[in-house]
Every structure is written in C-alpha cells, then in structure tokens.
Amino acid sequence: MLDNVLRIATRQSPLALWQAHYVKDKLMASHPGLVVELVPMVTRGDVILDTPLAKVGGKGLFVKELEVALLENRADIAVHSMKDVPVEFPQGLGLVTICEREDPRDAFVSNTYDSLDALPAGSIVGTSSLRRQCQLAERRPDLIIRSLRGNVGTRLSKLDNGEYDAIILAVAGLKRLGLESRIRAALPPEISLPAVGQGAVGIECRLDDARTRELLAALNHHETALRVTAERAMNTRLEGGCQVPIGSYAELIDGEIWLRALVGAPDGSQIIRGERRGAPQDAEQMGISLAEELLNNGAREILAEVYNGDAPA
C-alpha cells in the first residue's frame, strides 16, 4: 500500500456505496492529502436473492468476501452496516471504528396506509427479517407476512408494483438514500425493537495495521460505540447472527446505558423481553447478563428451534 492511499472494500448496493463514500469523505476531511479508493465487490448475500435470508444460513453473508480482501491485502478497510457484522471475526481482523449512528428505528412504508395499525386484516406485509416478522406477528396476527429480498430500490419497486400492501425497512437506509419521503411512520422501539447495531456504520481492518488504525481513530463515535458494544455483547452470548429473531437497542440517557432486548418465535407466538440499566463502563457485562436472563426465561428453546436444535449453551 502506498503511504498516502487507503483502499475501502465495499459491497456494490447503493446503500453500501453510500456508506463507503461517507467513510471516504470523513477520512479525506480528517487527513488532507490522503487518497481513498473504493474496491467494490459482490458477497454471497448479494447473489442469493430467491431465498429468505434465515434459510440461506451462515453468519456473515454480506461481509465474508470483504474480509477475504483484507486478509489478502487487496483492501485496507471494509465498511459494513453494523447489523450485518457477525459477532466473531477471522483471525487478524477486527472492528476498530464505529461511526455516529443514524436513526436506528424501523420504517413502515406503504402507498395506501399511514400506519401499521391502519392496515386492514389480511394485508400483505413484506420483510426479510425474522426480528421484524416476530414483532409484527405479535402485534398484528391478522396480517400476512411475506419474505422480501433485494436492495432498497428493489424492495420499493415490489411495493409499488402491488405485491405488498406495506413493507418494513430501516429508517437509516431510506434517509441515506434520499428516500425519507417514502417513510409513512417510524416505528418506536416499543413496537419494533431494532436489530443489533442498526443505523450504525462499522469499519473493519487488519489488527496489526497501526497506520490504518490511526487514520480511523478520528471517525470513532464514542457514544455510538458504547451503545453498540452493549447490543453486540448480548448478541454474542446468544450466538446470534444477523438472521435471527433477536432485537437489541441501547440508549445513553443521563449518563446511564438503558439496554432493551428480545428473542421471539418467528410466528410471534412467544417473545421473551428484558432490559438493563447501568454504567457505560459496564456495557459489555450488561449485554451478557441480559442475554443470560433471556436464555433462562425461554429464549434458549426459541433459538434452538430457529437454529435447528443447536441452541446456545
């Protein structure tokens, strides 16, 4: 790598490219003279579009190819949507920077109805997420929930073509793509608890690359990192990938972390919820202890079914 060049591995979807350009612009603003190049690539999750993500299986569907590029020194950093980042990293790689979080809520998107509660019984709602599915089914068991894959533009096209009465997307993604006007309602965490890390952008690099880590330090957002640390610690203990019915959301209020989490049966028949409040320095331990509580209260059995019998210990 040339001293003044930094290469970013990124997926090629519009949202992934937005994230990569966001990081590129931040780096160039912080380090005048730095040349930042994008290295676009295709991941397994981008290719398999005809199967619900939960059935594709495997963790890291959207990041593995980017990590291989780092290990082979074809790129210096990989930029990820934090909700897609597995809890474990290949040896020698790690998450070193978490950028400031955008709105983490889920968005209700419809051309006909103003809110989730306004949908008539039997309406078809699209989502690819078991987490969204279980919360939707609990609140509105009279809806028909169908799988919805593809990038944001593809999903909106399917809604506009009449395949769905409404779809659920991330507020952050719509805002970043300039599509905020499509949001009919942002769903509060009480109705749809977000995914772990939702709305945050993370940066992965080789852990022994001191120069790159130094360049990235200016982009780290301390409050976001604390919140996402608590969320990810809980997910790690639950052995959760990005395609499981797990929600987790941490807020920093009056100097204290408030962490909420849930594990749900995909059909909404049972959702185990819990919460913790504590000091920011205890973020990781809070996540672990909340996960233990959920497991002991029934989450172990729910996850065993989702993981085909392979439950967290």
Swiss-Prot record:
Monomer. The gene is hemC. Pathway: Porphyrin-containing compound metabolism; protoporphyrin-IX biosynthesis; coproporphyrinogen-III from 5-aminolevulinate: step 2/4. It holds the Pfam family Porphobil_deamC. Binds 1 dipyrromethane group covalently. The keyword Mitochondrion does not apply. Its EC number is 2.5.1.61. One of its GO terms (biological process) is protoporphyrinogen IX biosynthetic process. GO terms for molecular function: hydroxymethylbilane synthase activity. It comes from the Bacteria. InterPro entries: HemC (IPR000860), Porphobilin_deaminase_cofac_BS (IPR022419), Porphobilin_deaminase_N (IPR022417), Porphobilinogen_deaminase_C (IPR022418), Porphobilinogen_deaminase_C_sf (IPR036803). Its cofactor is dipyrromethane. The modification S-(dipyrrolylmethanemethyl)cysteine is found at residue 242. Keywords: Porphyrin biosynthesis, Transferase. The keyword Transferase applies. It comes from Escherichia coli O6:H1 (strain CFT073 / ATCC 700928 / UPEC). This is Porphobilinogen deaminase.
